[in-house]
A protein has these predicted regions:
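N-terminal membrane-targeting hydrophobic helices
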Residues: 1-149
Length: 149
């Protein structure tokens, strides 16, 4: 059997890699109202509108909790080690987007991450086409759930 520490680290690394690979697939992103210059990769940042920021953070929180709930419902960890692996996968899978959010505070040390994120992220934006983008993402989610099971 694999060393549990190594397995946890591998789970975390695979989750990060799967996030970047998934970003390469054209997908729908819900619009964030609190971002200034959303189409300009170099100059986009969080805006100063407090109510828009609260709304966006609320949307992201619901999105995150829903995703975690679905993962827990499918994987159903029982042992402590299973819980650790699932948490490592969740944190690793969410980390790239979290770091992108921090980057929009103009944190220069995150430039290498943003560069990597931009390389992997598809340039095909399905934001204006939710009737295509959302079903496409649902198909990808079903395939991912099938693999998990």
């Amino acid at each position: 059997p694999m060393n549990p520490y190594l397995a946890t680290l591998l789970t975390f690394a695979i989750a990060i890699a799967s996030h970047y690979l998934s970003d390469a697939i054209p997908h729908w992103d819900y619009p964030l109202q609190s971002i200034e210059n959303p189409e300009d990769k170099e100059n986009r940042k969080w805006g100063s509108g407090r109510s828009a920021l609260i709304k966006d953070i609320s949307s992201m929180a619901v999105d995150g909790f829903l995703g975690v709930g679905i993962v827990l419902a499918v994987v159903r960890p029982v042992t402590a080690q299973e819980w650790i692996w699932v948490i490592a996968a969740i944190v690793g899978g969410c980390l790239p987007d979290f770091l992108q959010g921090l980057y929009m505070f103009r944190l220069k040390f995150l430039r290498p991450h943003q560069w990597l994120h931009d390389i992997f992220h598809s340039n095909i934006r399905l934001g204006p086409y939710p009737l295509f983008g959302i079903p496409f993402q649902l198909i990808i989610a079903v395939i991912a759930l099938y693999i998990l099971m």
